[in-house]
Design a protein with these regions (language model features):
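Hydrophobic/aromatic beta-strand patches that form the interior of the parallel beta-sheet core
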Residues: 32, 60-62, 116, 148, ...
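Charged helix-capping and loop-helix junction motifs
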Residues: 45-47, 129-136, 168-171
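Metallo-beta-lactamase
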Residues: 30, 38, 154-178
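His/acidic metal-ligating clusters that form di-metal
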Residues: 26-27, 92-161
Length: 203
């Protein structure tokens, strides 16, 4: 069974539609959604409804930092423009949509797979995995073979061998990647709604 893992949708309806259509055309039957469904984009209500519908059909979903900010209100430490986006987004959502975002867990586990928006060592701290050191720290925080997270907006894979040797690489689109079971893997799929790798297409 093929599983589509997507993250950082950021209220971008056009990108979400394209990615969902593509995943379905590739035979995706399971869905994992790694948070940040709102923020930046113009269609938060539509995107939240799509995510909620997938969750009702059995998808796994976790909360992102933008989802939390919209639910709890803008932090005083946020820049003025970021606070404005949070407040605007909140005003676009009805009570049921806000309740859905508030109900999302920080992490989920399915067998030997761990799902989180930012990292596994402090999910609610929203620290980024910017390199091998953070990736290893995240992998050490769980006994799962595979960890999936978003937040970075650029696709990357990290791996850790049984003797503690770490490596990383950027995946090549359309090329299958073998995942040897003697390694732990940390997978960052990229971003649907706001990629930051220089490619305007959704990751």
């Amino acid at each position: 069974m093929k599983c589509a893992v997507i993250t950082d949708l950021h209220a971008n309806r056009e990108a979400v539609e394209a990615v969902l259509d593509h995943a379905r055309s590739q035979g995706a039957e399971r869905w994992v959604l790694l948070g940040d469904f709102v923020g930046y984009g113009a269609d938060p209500g539509w995107v939240v409804d799509q995510v909620r519908a997938l969750v009702r059909q059995g998808a796994i979903a976790v909360m992102g930092n933008h989802d939390q900010a919209v639910v709890r209100g803008a932090s005083p430490s946020m820049r003025a423009d970021a606070r404005h986006v949070v407040e605007w987004t909140r005003a676009q959502l009805d009570a049921s949509q806000l309740d859905f975002l508030a109900s999302l867990p920080m992490t989920q586990r399915h067998g030997d797979q761990f799902y989180v928006h930012a990292n596994a060592w402090a999910p609610a701290g929203w620290e980024y995995i910017t390199g091998r050191a953070e990736a290893v720290r995240s992998l050490h925080a769980t006994d799962c073979r595979y960890t999936f997270c978003g937040h970075m907006h650029e696709p990357k894979l990290f791996h850790l061998s049984g003797i503690g040797k770490a490596g990383d690489f950027v995946p090549t689109p359309g090329v299958a990647i073998p995942l040897p079971p003697h390694r732990q893997w940390l997978v960052i799929p990229g971003s649907v709604g706001q990629p930051r790798d220089g490619n305007p297409a959704a990751c």
